[in-house]
UniProtKB/Swiss-Prot annotation:
GO terms for biological process: 'de novo' IMP biosynthetic process. This is Phosphoribosylformylglycinamidine synthase subunit PurQ. It comes from Novosphingobium aromaticivorans (strain ATCC 700278 / DSM 12444 / CCUG 56034 / CIP 105152 / NBRC 16084 / F199). Part of the FGAM synthase complex composed of 1 PurL, 1 PurQ and 2 PurS subunits. Its EC number is 6.3.5.3, 3.5.1.2. The lineage of its organism: Bacteria, Pseudomonadati, Pseudomonadota, Alphaproteobacteria, Sphingomonadales. SMART domains: GATase_5 (SM01211). Part of the phosphoribosylformylglycinamidine synthase complex involved in the purines biosynthetic pathway. Catalyzes the ATP-dependent conversion of formylglycinamide ribonucleotide (FGAR) and glutamine to yield formylglycinamidine ribonucleotide (FGAM) and glutamate. The FGAM synthase complex is composed of three subunits. PurQ produces an ammonia molecule by converting glutamine to glutamate. PurL transfers the ammonia molecule to FGAR to form FGAM in an ATP-dependent manner. Gene3D superfamilies: 3.40.50.880. The keyword Nucleotide-binding applies. Residues 5-225 form the Glutamine amidotransferase type-1 domain. InterPro entries: Class_I_gatase-like (IPR029062), PRibForGlyAmidine_synth_PurQ (IPR010075). It comes from the Bacteria. The active site is at residues 89, 197, 199. The gene is purQ.
Amino acid sequence: MAFTSAVITFPGSNCDRDMAVAIEQVCGGTVHRVWHGDADLPEGLDFIALPGGFSYGDYLRSGAMAARSPVMQAVVRAAERGVTVLGVCNGFQVLTEAGLLPGALMRNAGIRFVCRDVKLTVENNQSLFTAGYDAGQQITIPVAHHDGNYFADDATLDRIEGEGRVAFRYAEEVNGSARNIAGVLNDRGNVLGMMPHPERMIEAAHGGSDGRALFESVVRGLVEA
């Protein structure tokens, strides 16, 4: 079975090529490049990725306008059918604005853009995205964001913690995120949003390969299982 994926590009996306290259190199198969104005997605998709960037210039709120793009209606329908969806950085913001993930991403504490490698702890390795890691494993993945401060009310935080839906946690305070949450799963486990950029860490020659296992986990879970 060939792996078929799509990378969504919004006006202002700037990590869409990086995401497509990572998927091509690690997962193989066919990677479709899909424009925000497309009302439909290609048939037979296994995986959809929403990349980082500054969609629509982050006007109104980060991800708010992109979440109302024609293509996002198709992405929401696909996610509800069980298609695997990954949102990274701005993609995470879009997923929360579209209602596919709980919480919101706010301006970083300190009102500063954060761009550096950070340590993450793998909180849940039982998901499709994280099965290639060990529970409690520390990995190094870069961040680059101004609005990555994850917020949810206490009841929501308690619920997602109790349901094992925190996929990744910052090993130390990075941007003010509630409980240092860096990545969150939906209740079905087929949608992951995370602020750090795993697609930038797939080759040791480029500074590290800790992000590679995420893509390997996805293709193994969807194709090789």
